[in-house]
């Protein structure tokens, strides 16, 4: 398993051939432009954990990725296009 800190709350987890991005927020930019993601996880709706301005481009660039987020983020950020998790 490889865990890469991409700034503030954002991490990239790589394990068993899978790439999972966690909390791509607005206080880090190094996640922008990432591709080949298998999953995107947003733990909660604060902007430092999900950047509402740029998340749509990330989701579009990783159309095959599973996207999961806290329920409030799912409702407040339509570009996230995520299924809610508890």
What residue spans do the PLM features occupy?
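Extreme N-terminal starter segment of soluble prokaryotic enzymes
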Residues: 1-4
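Pre-active-site segment of Zn-dependent metallo-hydrolases
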Residues: 6, 10-45, 52-60
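Short, well-ordered coil/turn elements that cap or connect secondary structure elements
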Residues: 15, 62, 77-80
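Short internal beta-strands
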Residues: 42, 63-72
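Generic structural signal for well-ordered secondary structure
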Residues: 48-51, 70
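Phosphate- and divalent-cation-binding pockets in alpha/beta enzyme and binding domains
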Residues: 49, 57, 75-77
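Metallo-beta-lactamase
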Residues: 69-86
């Amino acid at each position: 398993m490889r865990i890469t800190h991409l700034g503030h709350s954002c991490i990239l987890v790589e394990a068993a051939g899978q790439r999972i991005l966690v909390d791509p927020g607005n206080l880090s930019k190094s996640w922008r432009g990432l591709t080949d993601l298998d999953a995107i996880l947003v733990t909660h709706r604060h902007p430092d954990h999900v950047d509402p301005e740029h998340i749509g481009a990330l989701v579009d660039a990783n159309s095959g990725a599973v996207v999961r987020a806290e329920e409030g983020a799912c409702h407040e950020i339509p570009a996230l296009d995520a299924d809610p998790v508890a």
